[in-house]
């Protein structure tokens, strides 16, 4: 089972995965591409979000998806759709190459767990307008099948809301 936790920044992906791994040690954790690229490979990203930076993270995410065969137990911190959403929000004219890469790679997953932004979530975070806009784009992709990715791939998408414990139950293990 290859599961990706999807959502805008500062939504609780890391917390959810940490709790999941406490009781599911048999799963391999694929961390956030940004963290791996910076800490393990020494790559540098701009202080301001950019299409180029998110496209690089998308490429890396796709590489990591291809490393794991069907049947392996892997939990990914982000999925290609996340990066598509960021790119679409930053520059809708730049989505074509990203869309192609996402549609080719999404079938490497068995399930996506989408963490939507709650209406009352007013955290003090970096780039709050970007955070909200990306959540809106993710919502359109998952709930309304924008770009046709979900229907074309047949991937199972689960929406997880509430506390960390409630979200854990949504993962399905």
Pin down the residues of each PLM region.
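Conserved lysine of the Walker
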Residues: 13
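Conserved substrate/cofactor phosphate-moiety recognition/catalytic segment
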Residues: 18-64
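Glycine-rich phosphate-binding loop used to anchor ATP phosphates in small-molecule kinases
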Residues: 54-107
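The conserved Walker
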Residues: 9
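A glycine- and Lys/Arg-enriched "phosphate-lid" helix/loop adjacent to the NTP-binding pocket
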Residues: 90-146, 154-162
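Hydrophobic anchor at the beta1->P-loop junction of P-loop NTPases
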Residues: 5
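Short loop/turn segments at strand-loop or loop-helix junctions that form parts
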Residues: 32, 77-81, 113-119
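Pre-Walker A (Motif I) flank of P-loop NTPase domains
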Residues: 1-2
